[in-house]
Amino acid sequence: MKLTWIKCMSKTERISDIDEPRLFEENGVEAHIAAFVMPLLKPLGFRLVRVKLLGLNGLTLQIMVERPDGSMTVEDCETVSRTVSPLLDVQNVIERKYHLEISSPGIDRPLVRKSDFFHWQGHIAKIETKIILEGRRKFRGTLTNITQDGFTLNTDKAAYGESMYISIPFDDIIDAHLVLTDELIRDALKKNKDLSQQFISEDNQKLSKQERNYKN
């Protein structure tokens, strides 16, 4: 069945999949930077979310990064910055002066991998497609029925005669991100709390084992 790859994914497998490919990639200079940065991130335990050049208040190079579990601390951002910044300068990938910004995806994050859609199923997202579906290319609705090939969007507002449920293949997406809602904030905070407790529990188990070895 096509759902096997998602329904059989354990929490540990989802967390450890640092090599999961993104659904879409950058173009031009951004694509060049992404290709250069990705091999630098993996040994550090991070994966790329996206690269974006922003022109507000001067040129800003935003590199959005996360750990495979979706977490990203201030210290993590500093680690990535110290690794990436000097090498970008050596490569001279951007000829003009720019500001480097290493950031986490945030709560209203971009959805760039299939596991992102699975992880945030049930929440509202904005989707843009490369082809016209149901007479348009931009959609907003709740993510449901995630499969290996795509998902169903339960749209907020359907025009007269249009279906409220739209099936969207992953191959047809060019942009997707979550919409900030109270429910999303609560769920994101809960997931982060559960993850922190899991790591604390694992650390306690290691300490207990070390104590037993010491006593023996």
UniProtKB/Swiss-Prot annotation:
TM ranges: none
Highest rank taxon of the organism: Bacteria
Subcellular localization, as worded in the UniProt entry: Cytoplasm
Disulfide bridges in this chain: none
Keywords assigned by UniProt, alphabetized: Cytoplasm, Ribosome biogenesis
A matching Pfam family: DUF150_C
GO terms of biological process kind: ribosomal small subunit assembly; translation
GO CC annotations, alphabetized: cytosol
Keyword Iron part of the UniProt annotation: no
Function, as annotated: Required for maturation of 30S ribosomal subunits.
Family: Belongs to the RimP family.
The protein's name in its UniProt record: Ribosome maturation factor RimP
